[in-house]
């Protein structure tokens, strides 16, 4: 008689879960990557600010495929007779000019647009693994004073306020175009992050959790990411013995975490109590759960990301802004009020680069603030009106319904930030015949995705079918207003 031997093998974890565990056990490697990015970040932001501004015709590839993009529209014969526009020899850019252009392209044309995409697809991995500002803030916190976090700092409205103020200030100093302005804003933010980290917390990312200007934006976009760290509450509670607390840098209660919004996806908690693992999910799951976000989060989405951000991307190409500026200048001249037309503001207050023939008057600054604020109030107000109407008809909270706009908002931010990418590529003579169709396809995806989420929320949570149907015009208004703003920018202006 032979005894049968039965061997039990532990369940092999899915690939994503194993990736999360790898992140947890390879913290030193991740730290090395973070410090490498810190150095690269410093190179992109600091060095160009101390180099001369490039010549207006300097190009990264001025001797390569970009050469044909240079056209002389003012060519004249020896006797002064104007000649038809014709190709001219490209300007021979110096090494420091190419370096500044490369830094601008990499930082604004590649880095930031694809950070937005990474949040949409992978959650806040950028924050937990790659962000140089977060790494510096945590390092300072590990060697700082370790004070308790004051109540005023934990106010939920800081992300909204910081995003709005940073965006407005960035437009006044032309942060996308000039390295000095970029160093002022981004360097200032980094210094503030280090200072907050040194003062508060103990090895935590207090700045990232409560004060970072883009933390609120990333928290909203991460809600539709198809991967997240899933918490198995039953496994957590049934795990034998005591375990050390999770070293969660953004100060989350990991056991009760149900949203990817604040999770930095750093992987430190992966495998904890055999209850935390990196997992795939439906990108719609968190929005369709119908949980109500904080009012400050909903306002950031409606008036910040769909208002201020669109206004900031829009004013530089808006004929309405040009007409407003012209009319205001004429009005001032007629009344002999000339000081608003003076361009004597310092560069750190208003754009002032005479060598690049780019200076803002006091009138320009006032009108930029007025235009962006006006767009925010009009667009945000219209979106809020539509959401409020739909919410009242369907008897659901408007803040929960606002989350359905995240896909359209995220895609819109990517399209807006990629305008700088397009500017650089067009200057180099890159073929862009595909651009209009690509923009249209992405915008359509955003509208359809957000529309589908909104309808699902209405029909799933409204008390009856009739109320859900009555709410549809409100949802349609919110979607139409947001889409129309981008249609103006890309196709009508």
Predicted regions and their residues:
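Non-ligating segments of multi-cofactor redox enzymes
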Residues: 2-261, 271-493
């Amino acid at each position: 008689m032979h005894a049968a031997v039965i061997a039990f093998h532990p369940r092999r974890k899915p690939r994503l879960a194993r990736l999360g565990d790898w992140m947890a056990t390879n913290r030193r490697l991740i730290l090395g990557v973070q410090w490498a990015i810190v150095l690269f970040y410093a190179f992109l932001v600091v060095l160009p600010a101390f180099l001369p501004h490039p010549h207006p015709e300097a190009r990264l590839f001025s001797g390569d495929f970009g050469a044909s993009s240079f056209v002389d529209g003012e060519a004249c014969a020896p006797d002064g007779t104007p000649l038809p526009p014709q190709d001219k020899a490209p300007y021979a850019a110096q090494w420091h000019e190419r370096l500044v252009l490369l830094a601008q392209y990499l930082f604004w044309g590649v880095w930031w647009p694809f950070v937005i995409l990474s949040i949409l697809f992978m959650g806040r991995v950028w924050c937990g693994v790659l962000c140089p500002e977060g790494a510096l803030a945590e390092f300072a916190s590990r060697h700082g004073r370790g004070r308790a976090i004051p109540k005023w700092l934990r106010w939920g409205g800081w992300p909204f306020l910081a995003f709005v103020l940073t965006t407005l200030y960035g437009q006044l100093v032309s942060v996308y175009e000039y390295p000095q302005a970029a160093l002022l804003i981004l360097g200032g933010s980094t210094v503030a992050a280090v200072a907050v980290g040194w003062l508060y917390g103990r090895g935590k990312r207090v700045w990232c959790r409560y004060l970072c200007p883009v933390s609120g934006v990333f928290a909203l976009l991460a809600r539709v990411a198809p991967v997240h760290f899933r918490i198995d509450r039953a496994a957590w509670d049934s795990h034998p013995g005591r375990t050390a607390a999770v070293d969660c840098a953004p100060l989350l209660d990991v056991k009760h975490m149900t949203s990817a919004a604040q999770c930095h996806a750093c992987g430190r908690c992966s495998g904890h109590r055999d209850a935390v693992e990196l997992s795939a999910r439906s990108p719609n799951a968190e929005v369709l759960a119908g949980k109500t976000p904080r009012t400050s989060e909903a306002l950031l989405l409606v008036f910040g990301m769909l208002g201020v951000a669109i206004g900031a991307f829009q004013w530089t190409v808006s004929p309405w802004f040009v007409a407003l500026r012209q009319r205001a200048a004429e009005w001032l001249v007629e009344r002999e009020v000339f000081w608003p037309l003076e361009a004597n503001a310092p560069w750190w207050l208003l754009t002032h680069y005479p060598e690049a023939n780019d200076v803002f008057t006091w009138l320009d600054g006032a009108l930029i603030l007025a235009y962006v604020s006006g767009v925010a109030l009009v667009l945000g107000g219209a979106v809020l009106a539509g959401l409020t109407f739909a919410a009242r008809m369907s008897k659901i909270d408007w803040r929960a319904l606002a989350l359905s706009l995240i896909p359209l908002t995220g895609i819109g931010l990517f399209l807006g930030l990629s305008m700088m990418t397009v500017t650089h590529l067009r200057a180099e003579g890159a073929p862009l015949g595909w651009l209009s169709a690509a923009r249209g396809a992405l915008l359509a995806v955003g509208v359809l995705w957000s529309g589908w989420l909104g309808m699902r929320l209405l029909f799933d949570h409204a008390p009856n079918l009739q109320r859900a149907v009555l709410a549809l015009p409100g949802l349609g208004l919110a979607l139409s207003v947001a889409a129309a703003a981008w249609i103006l920018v890309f196709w009508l202006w």
